């Protein structure tokens, strides 16, 4: 590859789209006009388990948002111009408080997921005393998807003036910050003849998307070579629109 790595076409698609071998195989088969539905594929058990866990968590966050505990969040999002279509399109949710997180963990355990599974995907972390702490609390939750549309991580925005304002999932087996872009699937839908817009934050992407603009975010201000390669796999032209603060400059 141009980046100096070695591999075949499957490795390339897996790297660029941050997807599993099975998903890369299906994507290439579709591109080549081969019907892959008549074949069965053995997925990596660890990856399959983590994707199922994150999907389940994302569904729980969405339920929280539309429950009584999410009323304040819904009002905030409505004030920001995020309507029900955008909520559904970007699968936006709410992590809730400690009690709702404890309830979620108990449900996940009943469904066969272990605490180690939750630590591995970045939902729970351990402090120096080995006590388990919920990574996301009382945050607007925006799932980060791979190019197959599967949840691989989350971005959480705090309500009010707390710090940090945005909190991304830690790096995991599924999620590599130096490769992942936010909003790729929606940007491709809106691309047509419009130029791709690269911005900093989730809310920027969601706002631009609501007006029909193809936008993605780099999950921070630092663009890596992997990000740039992924960007030009989406579009030949792109505008860089970062914030006007010191970090954005």
Give the predicted meaning of each segment.
Residues 1-116, 120:
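Non-catalytic accessory segments of DNA primases and related replication-initiation nucleases
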Residues 13, 218-221, 242-244:
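Short beta->alpha connector loops at strand-helix junctions that form conserved
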Residues 5, 20, 179, 223, ...:
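Short acidic-hydrophobic sequence patches enriched in Asp/Glu that either
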Residues 203, 223, 243-249:
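Acidic, metal-coordinating catalytic cores used for nucleic-acid/nucleotide bond scission
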Residues 1, 10, 196-198, 235-247:
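Acidic beta-strand-to-loop metal/phosphate-binding motif
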Residues 63-65, 95, 195-196, 218, ...:
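Residue-level marker of alpha-helix boundaries and capping positions
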Residues 30, 93-95, 124, 224-225, ...:
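Short secondary-structure capping/turn micro-motifs that flank functional sites
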Residues 98-238:
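Phosphate-handling DNA/RNA-contact segment within nucleic-acid enzymes
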């Amino acid at each position: 590859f141009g980046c100096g790595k070695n591999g075949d076409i499957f490795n390339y698609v897996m790297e660029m789209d941050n997807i599993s071998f099975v998903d890369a195989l299906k994507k290439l088969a579709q591109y080549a006009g081969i019907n892959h539905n008549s074949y069965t594929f053995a997925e990596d058990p660890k990856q399959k388990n983590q994707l199922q866990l994150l999907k389940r968590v994302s569904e729980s966050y969405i339920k929280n948002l539309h429950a009584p505990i999410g009323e304040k969040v819904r009002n905030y999002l409505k004030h920001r111009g995020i309507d029900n279509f955008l909520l559904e399109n970007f699968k936006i949710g709410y992590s809730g408080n400690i009690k709702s997180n404890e309830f979620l963990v108990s449900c996940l355990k009943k469904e066969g997921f272990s605490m180690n599974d939750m630590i591995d995907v970045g939902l729970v972390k351990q402090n120096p005393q080995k006590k388990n702490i919920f990574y996301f609390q009382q945050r607007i939750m925006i799932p980060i998807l791979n190019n197959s549309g599967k949840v691989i991580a989350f971005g959480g925005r705090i309500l009010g003036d707390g710090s940090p304002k945005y909190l991304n999932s830690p790096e995991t087996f599924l999620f590599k910050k130096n490769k992942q872009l936010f909003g790729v699937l929606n940007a491709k839908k809106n691309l047509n003849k419009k130029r791709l817009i690269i911005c900093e934050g989730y809310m920027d992407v969601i706002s631009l998307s609501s007006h029909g603009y193809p936008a993605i975010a780099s999950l921070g201000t630092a663009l890596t070579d992997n990000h740039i390669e992924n960007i030009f796999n989406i579009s030949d032209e792109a505008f860089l629109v970062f914030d006007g603060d010191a970090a954005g400059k």
